[in-house]
Amino acid sequence: NGECDVAFAAGRPPGHHAVPDRAMGFCLFNNAAVGAAKLAAAGEKVAIVDWDVHHGNGTQDIFYDDPNVLYVSTHESPLYPGTGQLRETGRGDGVGTNLNLPFPEGTAGDTYRAAFDEVIVPVVERFAPDWVFISAGFDGHRNDPLAGLRLTSGDYADMARRLQALVPARRLLVVLEGGYDLQALS
């Protein structure tokens, strides 16, 4: 019937570093931000959960003062682009709609699951979004050559299931971000 419960945008290049006036970090257009901005302009509340190994500085900057878009980032720190600290929580009307969870090199799935259980899921539930976007970078996979997190394919599946449970069917959009080990991506 042409309907699906989850949409997956397998586009390249990734987008979460791109800001409105320039490309950054392999990213030309901020694909997740374009979709979220369109929905927010129509009065919808959108949560973007970014689990790429790098902080999505572009997405954070675009929505930093927007109360209708919640941005949550889990990422390795220190690592490019050097942003995404705990103290970066939003500005103006957007204070409290930006959450960064920086993790050290070597962090594995058990820590991510605890972060989802204790922080991310409760924050997203309180925000009560109409839509959830996942900026799905798979460069935190333990086999990825560009960083040092220790996530597995099963960890990503678990995080996706937890986020899918937070919104009705057909309200979850997954946008491919980074990931440079082709076997881990498949």
Segments from the language model and where they lie:
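A general "terminal functional-core" signal
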Residues: N1-S186
